[in-house]
Amino acid sequence: EVGFDGGTRELARRLGVTQPLIYRYFPSKEDLIRAVYEEVYLTQWDPAWEVLLADAARPLRERLIAFYEGYTAAIFKPDWLRIYLFSGLRGLEINRWWITFVEQHLLRQIAEAVRLDNGLPSTAKTPVSAEELELFWMFHGGIFYYGLRREVYLKPPELSLGRFIANSVDAMLLGLPPVLKRVVPAPT
């Protein structure tokens, strides 16, 4: 309710505990923020999603739709989105931690799968460039923004989330390959 600007004394009062009790478990405010990150963000990440995305026996479109249906169910919650936005506005590291996590556990995996589906070199042979990574952020960010409109701005899109995800995946899979063929260099 007060974001990350509140002090531990006020937090203790709201929780009905003493401030020393908070410091017993969290020696610093940074430790408390890291615990919030782990609880709010990392516990929402399902490691099975990475297995799903890597399952080349299933069509890529099907894997991406299944992933984003699960992922959006986990993060399109007012508290999750508010904490994410407030921490970003305050310059806290939570956002940088999460962005790094998403790049490592999701976007690079999607880049690899899209490359393989389009006969491009694997990321092991030709690492993902900053330009290529931004193409996948564009795709991912579009889906994320649906949640902001619905949960934060309280202006739900007129298209169902399922249809929006399917359309986003289709647009990426059909539109991105020509750009990737220009952006991804041949292996050396």
Please provide the spans of the model-predicted regions:
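Amphipathic alpha-helical packing segments from all-alpha helical-bundle domains
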Residues: 62, 73, 83-85, 93-122, ...
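Helix-turn-helix
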Residues: 1-35
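A short secondary-structure junction motif
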Residues: 39-47, 78, 109, 113, ...
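Amphipathic alpha-helical segments used for helix-helix packing
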Residues: 49, 75-97, 148-152
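Amphipathic alpha-helical linker/stalk segments
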Residues: 13, 36-67
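Hydrophobic/aromatic residues within well-ordered alpha-helical segments
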Residues: 29, 36, 40-41, 67, ...
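Hydrophobic/aromatic-rich alpha-helical bundle segments in the mid-to-C-terminal region
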Residues: 96, 118-170, 179-188
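Helical hydrophobic small-molecule/effector-binding pocket
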Residues: 38, 42, 61-86, 139-145
